Amino acid sequence: STFLVSVAIFSPSKQEIQQKSKATLVCLASGFYPDHLTLVWRVNGVKRTEGVGTDEYSTQNGSTYSLTSRLRMPAWEWFNPLNRFECVANFFQNGTTASINKVIHEISRNCRVS
C-alpha cells in the first residue's frame, strides 16, 4: 500500500515577530497512516528540541492523517541568513523506514520588517 506523504513548512507571522520578537515555524506532514510518522526539527543539521511542540495526536482526513509540529525561536535567529531550518518526517512505508525533509531559509523568507 503506497501513500503519498507530504511535508510543508510555514513561515512565522509578521505580527508575532513585531509584537513578541519571536518566530514560530510550523511543519505540517500529511497523507500518512496513524502511528507511522514522527517529526524532527533540525537547525543547521543539528536536531533541535528546545522550543519544539508537536501535536500529541494526528488528525484524520478521510483515510489518511496529518500531524503538526511547531518550532519557536527568537526573531534574530530566524533572520540570521546563515541559519537553515529543516523539518524531517520519518515514517514506515512498505516495511521500511523512509524520510522526507523540507528546508526553509532566507531565500524563501519575506523581507525583514524594519
Mark where each language-model region is.
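Terminal anchoring/processing modules of extracellular glycoproteins
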Residues: 1-114
